[in-house]
């Protein structure tokens, strides 16, 4: 009974009919070990999933719990684990991707219309599924007008938000940048459940960003970067 049983049934049906599908998993301080455990990965691979996206918990909303953000050690470990699973050193048969830690392969943040944007249930065009601010709505604006809205243009003007792509996000790792963009462009909160001032949102990320910075710099320096990947930035 419940959601778990429904998901298991859906996966079984997809596998039975040969439909390629993947998973979407949010990792937190409390579950990161469980959802990256080799036994769990083999389980979802056996259920038929061939790829999956891992999403770092984002403290979005008035009732968010910043204490659920992974520890520095957990984040460093998931980087290693995800990349190990993608190597030929195992037979798991599942290809995981990490939305927060794979920035190197897509040139950092892809939001704000650089490669994608999000439309919520009200039609508000937001730069990212985690960033609920906007100045345009699909009901009243064309796609071109949405892409040209001030907040999206501010994104494009500033991307990449960090040359270290282990610090790609203007909220989580560079919270001062999102605050500046939202305030300068006059974008309004579009969170339908829990409208939130950008200062309050980013305030929950400041300590995390400060502590993650030296870890990210060390890991970035240790990486063997063969070339810069996919840098479709606005020309400056």
Model-inferred region functions:
Residues 130-236:
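Flexible mid-to-C-terminal extensions adjoining Fe-S/redox cofactors in radical SAM and related proteins
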Residues 1, 69-76, 136-141:
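Short, conserved loop/turn and helix-capping segments at secondary-structure boundaries
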Residues 8, 38, 76-83, 144:
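Generic alpha-helical structural signal
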Residues 20, 57-127, 168-177:
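A C-terminal junction/extension of Radical SAM enzymes
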